[in-house]
């Protein structure tokens, strides 16, 4: 599977992790928290630099 992902600085990555952790402390499941933060990042970085990644887990 191919996917374009936002190119994030280390600081942006750290903030995303902290937000996911906070959402989980507030009772959200890890999957929901990750999905929410990922969607927010995609929206915020729409039209900006993207990094193409390949997920090799599909067989």
Curated annotation (Swiss-Prot):
Pfam families: UPF0181. Belongs to the UPF0181 family. This is UPF0181 protein plu2693. It comes from Photorhabdus laumondii subsp. laumondii (strain DSM 15139 / CIP 105565 / TT01) (Photorhabdus luminescens subsp. laumondii). The lineage of its organism: Bacteria, Pseudomonadati, Pseudomonadota, Gammaproteobacteria, Enterobacterales.
């Amino acid at each position: 599977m191919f996917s374009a992902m936002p190119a994030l600085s280390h600081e942006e990555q750290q903030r995303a992790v902290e937000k996911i952790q906070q959402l989980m402390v507030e009772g959200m499941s890890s999957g929901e928290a990750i999905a929410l933060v990922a969607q927010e990042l995609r929206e915020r970085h729409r039209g900006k630099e993207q990094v193409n990644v390949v997920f090799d887990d599909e067989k």
